[in-house]
Structure formats: C-alpha cells, structure tokens
Design a protein with these regions (language model features):
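Short loop/turn segments that connect beta-strands within the blades of beta-propeller domains
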Residues: 15-16, 25, 34-35, 77, ...
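Short loop/turn segments that connect beta-strands within beta-propeller blades
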Residues: 33-37, 96-100, 144-148, 187-190, ...
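A short beta-strand motif characteristic of beta-propeller blades
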Residues: 1-3, 40, 57-63, 103-112, ...
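Beta-rich, blade/repeat-based domains predominating
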Residues: 4-18, 51-80, 111-129, 138, ...
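Blade-level signature of beta-propeller repeat domains, shared across WD40, Kelch, NHL, RCC1
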Residues: 200-230
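Conserved beta-strand positions in repeat-built beta-propeller and related beta-rich domains
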Residues: 21-24, 83-86, 130-135, 170-178, ...
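Structural signal for beta-propeller blades
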Residues: 27-30, 90-92, 138-140, 179-184, ...
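Beta-propeller domains
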Residues: 82, 86-104, 108-150
Length: 230
C-alpha cells in the first residue's frame, strides 16, 4: 500500500479480499484491493468535523458529521459501509457502497443507549446488525442497520475490537481498567460469555477460518497468535 499513503492507519480489516481501514490522524476512511490499488476515499484528508474538542479520547462536547479521527470502517452484506467515528467524535456513520452518506447516529455520553465515549471498533453481521465497541464506557452496543438500539453487553472492560468467527461466535479484545487484566472473551449471539482468557493488551484482533486468534499489540509492536485446541 505504501507507507507514504498513511498518517496513522487504524482499524484494518479484510472482507472478500478488499482492504478497509481508516487513517485516524487525517480523518479519512480508505478502501483498497488486496494488492494495494486505491478504490475509495471517504472524507477529505486533514479536515476534521467540529466537535468542540481537540484532545483525543476525551468525552467530546457534541457530536458532529464525518469525520474526526475515525476508528474503523466495516462493510455490510448489502454493501453499505459503516464507520465508528471514534477518537474525537461519538457517532456511527452509514454510507452507500458508493460513499454517499445515508445517516449518522450517536451522541456523547456515559450511560444511555446511543451514547458513546470513544466508539473504537464496529462490526456488521450477516443479519446486518451493527455492533459498536463503546470502549470508554466498557460495553458493546447493538443496533439495527438504521441505528435503532437493540441491546448492550456490559460484562467487559474497555473493548478495543470485536470480530466474528465462521460459526457466528464473537471475539472481543478487552483492555485493562482500574487494575483488571486484559484478555479475550468469546461470546454467543446474545453476548453470553462462552470462554475467556488473559492475554497481552490487544488493540485489534481477528479470527481466521480455523478459529485461530490474532492480536495486534500496539505497545509491544507485535502480533500474538492463539491456536484453537479442540
């Protein structure tokens, strides 16, 4: 892809051999072929929406349109693109496959459904339900494709990333909070914990077709792999 193409790449994922990621510092979302051919840029490089705050990670005074330090872009089966806009905003944005904004939802907050404090990762399942890692609120919120709140999972600490295995189970990378140990939790479709183990603190994770788990460690600048044992 070329190192000069990015300022701070974030939220990297591959779906159907297409690469999706954000450039957090430049406030753009990017789409590439697997061999690095640019397909789409959402946003204007270096132009950040006005949320009344310039400190990354703080609870922002107000929500705004796309983008201000977006954290991840993920495609839905329909082709729509969803973005968690994240580090200096508190919204989810939904676009057509051609990059036209359909809608946005979310406001800054710490408790109520639809309130976010650093939506850090986003996942769309085969039913087009939207899962948002509301990291600084230590929960995952689940929405319909139109942004209607369904439920939230709260038995976790600072979820950095979420992905889904081929069997439909969800894997969540949880980071430490107030002395807790970072780890990985495996959950069913209702959010019930099926398994949990301690790990190094992962900023991102992915599960392959064999249910092996890969953790991206920003602090250690490395990748850990966990192999499934049947």
């Amino acid at each position: 892809l070329g190192i000069s193409a990015f300022n701070l790449p974030h939220g990297f994922c591959i779906v159907d051999d297409i690469v999706y990621l954000t450039d957090r510092e430049d406030s753009v979302c990017l789409k590439y072929t697997s061999d690095g051919k640019p397909l789409m840029v959402l946003g204007e490089r270096g132009v950040h929406s006005d949320i009344g705050c310039e400190k990354t990670g703080d609870l922002v005074p107000r929500a705004a349109g796309p983008f201000n330090y977006p954290s991840e872009m993920f495609p839905a089966p329909s082709g729509d693109l969803y973005v968690s806009d994240g580090y200096r905003n508190s919204r989810v944005h939904r676009f057509t496959k051609d990059g036209q904004l359909i809608q946005s939802w979310g406001v800054p907050g710490k408790e109520a459904p639809g309130e976010f404090h650093l939506p850090h990762s986003i996942l769309i399942d085969e039913e087009e339900l939207v899962y948002v890692c509301d990291r600084e609120n230590s929960r995952i919120q689940v929405f319909t494709p139109d942004g209607e709140f369904i439920t939230m999972w709260t038995d976790m600490t600072r979820p950095n990333d979420i992905c889904q295995s081929k069997d439909g189970d969800f894997y969540v990378a949880e980071s430490s909070f107030q002395g807790s140990t970072p780890g990985i939790s495996v959950r069913d479709r209702q959010g019930k914990v099926l398994a949990r183990w301690d790990s190094r603190s992962a900023h991102g994770l992915w599960v392959d077709s064999q249910d092996n788990v890969y953790l991206a460690l920003t602090g250690a600048e490395s990748v850990d792999k966990y192999m499934r044992r049947d």
